[in-house]
């Protein structure tokens, strides 16, 4: 087979021995000195990690997650090791794969162009350096990594007798181990790292270990992995700058109203209920990407709930408190500021789940102020809730509740780490390599600044969410109890615009689609391209991605997709049209706050509190 006949086929006939030149140490004395300096910085990192533990300020709970991982993976290994025939099958498959890999390597050494098998992911960004293919040593390591990872995933996939949750957890843990042990994460097995270390005589490691010490100190004994240059951003100065006012606040939230940019506005105001797991300004990163600014420019009177970054004082604030003191409070303020009782609403992620539960409570109480709801990547049925379910079972929740009881909240870093682990090969290890092994400062990126601006969660709120939604799926079953009432989404008759994103790993499209059938009224289901953030924050001017529209969300999403219409670009104009079809009446533009005195300029002070 020739290179022309097979795309991706490679051989080593053109391998030039001179290409090993960049891998030969030229100045061993400088390298030795820098290695000593790197070790000194590593010692400072260790001291920064130990100091809060020796002072009794921090205790570690490594045992629980490690124990759970070992217990889960042992169930997989038990299946394969309990029967000699299965053991032989597993060993034969792995050894056969390595034999094939060795044969391909020998053929390439002989100058033959050999195509990689399908399970070798040649488009993996981690292996972009050309020496991963051109250099026989690194090519062999690359192949061995993918072969072994594929085999481990197959062992989980083919193990019989596992319940769905155990299999899901096992697959997740295998992916975490594979991501951590990737040869791209080590100097001696990553050609680019090896060359850079030789070229700089180890200066990259000195800088990297210095950054490691700084990041552990910044995390008060925990690694606060820097994903972007946070010094380049300031909330209210070059991020979250759409003009507006904070017009009310309580212990749970501030209510913001944004200044009109059009002469007339839609009669119905718009209330946005963002997640409290992150901060609302993901919808207002900058003027070019701001959904809030775009909505204002379409004639929407936009109100936003800015949740408090809680501390021990908020330990008892549960879902009812967030429904009453968040959404209910905001509705009262909107009526005072505008005189309007009828409101359109948006809920994003867990903010959408809270909004849906509040709508069910309002239906039971006869509160009809919210006349439509738009849900961004929101789950109300958690049957197919994705990889976050890995962290949710009764044992893990009880352990988490015990930890939260000591402080009254869940540390923001814990939730941030969980989200980053969902995409460890993209959100953890590339930054580990760039920062601590290459010694390079990360580039400024507004979305990653927002991602690093984590929030705490009140103990009562977080426990209620995990148990009632992820563990017991009570909302979709009509079994959730709020304010002493059992609430049902079937009682929610108002129009729903339900947006899912195709590549969402937090609220999978399949899960969002299934939840559509829980509501008692008409649901317009829309599927956007990309993922949990980029699929939502997709302004029309960028002409990126696409969205699908179709019939009623019944049956399964695959059948729905087969009949859906694909439209290039952003879904935002489609949503605006949906809102205006519900009520297109307009009134003169409103002053922010109306008769209410503003407290401060948007984005307010609550959003500036860091975890």
UniProtKB/Swiss-Prot annotation:
It is found in: Cytoplasm. Keywords: Acyltransferase, Cytoplasm, PHB biosynthesis, Transferase. The active site is at residue 349. It holds the Pfam family PhaC_N. InterPro entries: AB_hydrolase_fold, PHA/PHB_synthase, PHA_synth_I, PhaC_N. It catalyses: (3R)-3-hydroxybutanoyl-CoA + [(3R)-hydroxybutanoate](n) = [(3R)-hydroxybutanoate](n+1) + CoA. It is an enzyme of class 2 (transferase). Pathway: Biopolymer metabolism; poly-(R)-3-hydroxybutanoate biosynthesis. One of its GO terms (biological process) is poly-hydroxybutyrate biosynthetic process. Its EC number is 2.3.1.-. One of its GO terms (cellular component) is cytoplasm. GO terms for molecular function: acyltransferase activity. It comes from the Bacteria. PANTHER family: POLY(3-HYDROXYALKANOATE) POLYMERASE SUBUNIT PHAC, POLY-3-HYDROXYBUTYRATE SYNTHASE. Monomer. Polymerizes D(-)-3-hydroxybutyryl-CoA to create PHB which consists of thousands of hydroxybutyrate molecules linked end to end. PHB serves as an intracellular energy reserve material when cells grow under conditions of nutrient limitation. Belongs to the PHA/PHB synthase family. Type I PhaC subfamily. This is Poly(3-hydroxyalkanoate) polymerase subunit PhaC.
